[in-house]
Amino acid sequence: KRCLLVSYLPISGTNSKLVIVNLHLEAYDSGEGKAAQTRMLADILQNEAAAGNYVIAGGDFNQTFSNVDLSAYPQQSADLWAPGSIDVSEFGDSFTCITDSSAPTCRSLDKPYEGHDHESFQYYVIDGFIVSSNLQINSTETINLDFKNSDHNPIRLDVALK
């Protein structure tokens, strides 16, 4: 139902590639689909890193990373969709799961956003990146556009090759 787009970019002067995985994982399932997609993603990332490539996976995980403090975005109601959690240890020591929770990356779609009381709205941090250890993470930033264009805010990652 959802997808991964894997792109390979050559790195001049090396046999390695920068592997970019753009993703949108399952949201509305009982959990088995998300778990299977996460395992498949982990396998792809680990295989690419083992081949000596630089790897970044990023997008809408429709899950939260287990290493992120989400206390600023409590579940407002049991009636609203709640994301699952990705245990970041599933990706091993060769990867970092990272996002920026200083602003929400997503909002609920249960009611119109414009003109709504933003204090009682449901927010999530379900977008982010998984980065291989041969890349230096300089920064990650959620750009708070107040959901002007989408139900997601963009998130930016700045990395350098080690």
Give the predicted meaning of each segment.
Residues 135-145:
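Low-complexity, intrinsically disordered Gly/Pro/Thr-rich segments
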Residues 3-5, 19, 128, 153-155:
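Short beta-strand micro-motifs in enzyme catalytic cores
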Residues 1-17, 23-25, 143:
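Structured beta-strand-rich core segments of catalytic domains in phosphoester-bond hydrolases
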Residues 23-25, 59-61, 153:
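Active-site metal-binding loops of divalent metal-dependent hydrolases
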Residues 1, 12-15, 49-50, 120-124, ...:
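Extracellular/periplasmic catalytic domains that process cell-envelope and extracellular macromolecules
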Residues 30-134:
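Metal-dependent phosphoesterases centered on the DNase I-like endonuclease/exonuclease/phosphatase
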Residues 30-33, 147-151:
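Solvent-exposed loop/turn segments connecting transmembrane beta-strands
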Residues 6-13, 131-133, 150, 157-162:
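Active-site beta-strand termini and strand-to-loop segments that position acidic
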